[in-house]
């Protein structure tokens, strides 16, 4: 998977570079849920060809691989898959989803498709359950990962305190943002399981702007519409979610 995407000079996410690796990866994940006949119906690819792909005897190439990847993502009901694994019924425990490597591969592919062609130079998980997904993406597209922590972080980087008040009142809380040195002109993709606290997020956006870092994209697995409206996401920034609550 780590070799499936090459880092371009523009730092945009490039789905055309060896997409066969992740397409086959997804086929193998889906094979655990469907038989070859069902997969053939979904993809329009003969069973014999699917067998060769999944067993590693051959692999789709170039534009064919990219078309296959898009076809797979269009035919996977991610919202239903997440609901099924997390028992979503208005309240949800996402640990079963975000710690499942097979589901992470599908969500990761979905994110790469959503933000394909956009300048992304770093990945920033906003909650603890989104760290595995952020790590997967960071490895997949060879981008550094920022960290946001409720505890001070000591590392070879630049740690910035973020002071905010939940719901704009009460006692002040502090988080720490760990970014790389020489981060000016970075464009960050934030990853979260649910919509982050608006006060924390809006303060984070201010801190990023002060350090000449752009918000390149916003992704959350589950979006609560009321909280989403309170986020000060800059105009033109792509936002993406799987389930709207």
Residue ranges of model-derived segments:
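Short glycine-rich phosphate-binding loop at a beta-alpha junction
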Residues: 119-129
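Conserved acidic residues
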Residues: 121, 186, 216
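Short Gly/Thr/Asp-enriched flexible loops that form oxyanion-binding sites at enzyme active sites
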Residues: 133-141, 204
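Alpha-helical residues within the helix-turn-helix
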Residues: 41
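Active-site-facing substrate-recognition patch
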Residues: 10-33, 37-38, 52-119
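Short, glycine/charge-rich flexible loops or terminal/linker lids adjacent to PRPP-binding catalytic cores
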Residues: 142-189, 198, 202
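PRPP-dependent phosphoribosyltransferase catalytic core
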Residues: 2-22, 203-245
């Amino acid at each position: 998977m780590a070799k499936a995407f090459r880092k371009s000079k523009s730092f945009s996410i490039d789905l055309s570079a060896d997409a066969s690796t992740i397409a086959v990866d997804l086929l193998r994940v889906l094979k655990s849920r469907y038989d070859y006949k069902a997969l053939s119906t979904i993809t329009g690819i003969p069973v014999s060809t699917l067998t060769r792909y999944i067993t590693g005897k051959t692999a789709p190439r170039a534009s064919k691989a990219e078309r296959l990847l898009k076809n797979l993502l269009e035919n996977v009901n991610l919202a239903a898959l997440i609901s099924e694994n997390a028992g979503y019924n208005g309240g949800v425990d996402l640990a079963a989803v975000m710690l499942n490597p097979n589901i992470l591969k599908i969500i990761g592919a979905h994110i790469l498709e959503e933000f394909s062609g956009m300048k992304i130079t770093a990945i920033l998980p906003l909650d603890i359950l989104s760290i595995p997904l952020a790590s997967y993406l960071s490895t997949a597209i060879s981008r550094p990962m920022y960290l946001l922590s409720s505890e001070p972080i000591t590392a070879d980087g630049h740690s910035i305190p973020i002071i905010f008040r939940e719901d704009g009142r009460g006692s002040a809380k502090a988080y720490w943002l760990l970014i790389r040195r020489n981060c000016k002109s970075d464009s960050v993709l934030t990853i979260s399981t649910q919509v982050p606290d608006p006060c924390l997020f809006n303060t984070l956006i201010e801190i990023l702007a002060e350090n000449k870092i752009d918000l390149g994209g916003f992704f959350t697995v589950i979006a609560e519409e009321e909280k989403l409206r309170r986020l000060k996401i800059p105009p033109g920034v792509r936002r993406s979610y799987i389930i709207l609550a």
